[in-house]
């Protein structure tokens, strides 16, 4: 697995915390929706979805999601 992947100008770092906890992560700016909930930076979210598809095309089971403080993750399931 590559240590880093660049997608749409965003650099995703690979984190391996064991066989059940492997993912790519990247942090962007924090945005808020109309209900004042944190959401990921729009361009970064698009990049995460693109990375998810790239990993699926390579045969991995992948899922893009986001957490707080601008972080997005693409988990390998």
What is the role of each PLM region?
Residues 15-72:
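Acidic, low-complexity, intrinsically disordered interaction modules
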Residues 1-21:
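Short, extreme N-terminal segment that most often corresponds to the first beta-strand
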Residues 1-3, 71, 75-77:
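Short intrinsically disordered terminal tails
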């Amino acid at each position: 697995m590559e240590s880093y992947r660049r997608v749409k100008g965003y650099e995703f770092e690979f984190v391996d915390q064991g066989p059940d906890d492997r993912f790519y992560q990247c942090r962007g700016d924090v945005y808020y929706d109309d209900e004042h909930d944190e959401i990921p930076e729009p361009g970064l979210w698009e990049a995460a979805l693109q990375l998810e598809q790239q990993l699926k095309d390579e045969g991995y089971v992948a899922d893009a999601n986001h957490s707080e403080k601008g972080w997005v993750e693409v988990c390998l399931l």
